[in-house]
Amino acid sequence: MVFIDTARIYIKAGDGGNGFISFRREKYVPYGGPDGGDGGKGGDVIFIADPNLSTLLDFKYKRKYIAENGENGKSKNQYGKDGEDLYIKVPVGTTIINDETGEVIADLIKPYQKAIVLKGGKGGRGNAKFATPTLKTPRFAESGEKGREMWVRLELKLLADVGLVGFPNAGKSTLLASCSRARPKIANYPFTTLTPNLGVVEHKGKSFVMADIPGLIEGAHRGEGLGHDFLRHIERTKMLIHVVDVSGSEGRDPVEDFEKINEELRLYDERLVTLPQIVAANKMDLPEGKEKYPRFEEEIKKRGYEVYPISALTKEGLDALLDKTIEILSSIPAEKIEEVPEVIVYNPPEEEETLEVEVKGNTYYLKGSKIDKLLKRINLQDEHSLRYFEILLRKSGVIDALKEKGFKSGDVINVRDFEFEYYE
């Protein structure tokens, strides 16, 4: 299966259904009154962590996800049906990010954990809701609220106990294959591994998940080589096994290799160099490996790290390496995953309301997000709806703002080229 660990998708919550305008008309009921029902709520957009998924491949082919709209209200005070919620399945370990602001919306690290990212628009009220002792036959209803929309970025960070790090061709994939049933592509050239591989290691009655991270090079923290594409997969690991080609088969100095990789980890995220780390001096089956190992061991121990001479190819030294790995993992306190909320509810920041006023004679031209928001639920062509709009203008403080500019009763208000005289 193709491994995809990033995606950018468009999501939209469902629109609320419109309120309905109707009047009860039945024999022997001469004054039936309004009976228009409310519109249904739009569907939410909900992400759910599915343990059966391991890649974001599906989002390569489909990038727009829109929840169902609520149904319009009906006569006889019947409410419209709510829109179906839209569930989007992602692998466990997926981070959902607001693409515009970079804000982390949710981090789904527990199987079946949910994140309600966008809530559906509210249904509009039917005309029955607007009946008052002074307005017995309202001939208007509210339009449904539009569902919010946004672009989000999905980033998958693998959930593994142990991360294998090192230069390309150091032998990480061979080590993973020797320790587990994973079968990563193995060849004698750099960057054979282009995607992370996971394997379950079973050793002396214990088991853990090991991740083979594609080889790093100098500048990886800046995105060079495979860079940021895969460094993030180390973030969730509990410890690192630093695999070094101690034979220097690529013409590099093993000690310098060790230093450079740790520096890249530090530059990417300081926390990574604080993770428990042991060093696997690989390719001890080669004469050059045996020759260079004593100096390498001395230098690495000076830096405070434990070194284990191994051959990933012949499996020499693997028992001691895995014994130490299990010892370290057993000493790390288990994460309190039960404290992770089952459902995350995201509340996107509200857009700042704006009101623009242009005065020409006794006509006041209004525009801006504040007016747009009020108009979403108004039918300006209906007299009763227009009266309700005037009430909203007062309640929202727009009329007070106009009075500061000299507005008075009898002046004209213009919104979207529709004009009406306002009287108090």
UniProtKB/Swiss-Prot annotation:
Domain Obg: 1-159
Signal peptide: none
Binding-site positions, GTP: 166-173, 191-195, 212-215, 282-285, 311-313
Keyword Cytoplasm: yes
GO BP terms in the entry: ribosome biogenesis
Subcellular locations according to the entry: Cytoplasm
Enzyme class: hydrolase
Gene3D superfamilies, per database record: GTP-binding protein OBG, C-terminal domain (3.30.300.350), GTP1/OBG domain (2.70.210.12), P-loop containing nucleotide triphosphate hydrolases (3.40.50.300)
InterPro entries: G_OBG, GTP-bd, GTP-bd_Obg/CgtA, GTP-bd_prot_GTP1/OBG_C_sf, GTP1-OBG_CS, GTP1_OBG_dom, GTP1_OBG_dom_sf, OBG_GTPase
Stored NCBIfam families: Obg_CgtA, Obg_CgtA_exten, PRK12296.1, PRK12297.1, PRK12299.1, small_GTP
Protein name: GTPase Obg
Record organism: Caldanaerobacter subterraneus subsp. tengcongensis (strain DSM 15242 / JCM 11007 / NBRC 100824 / MB4)
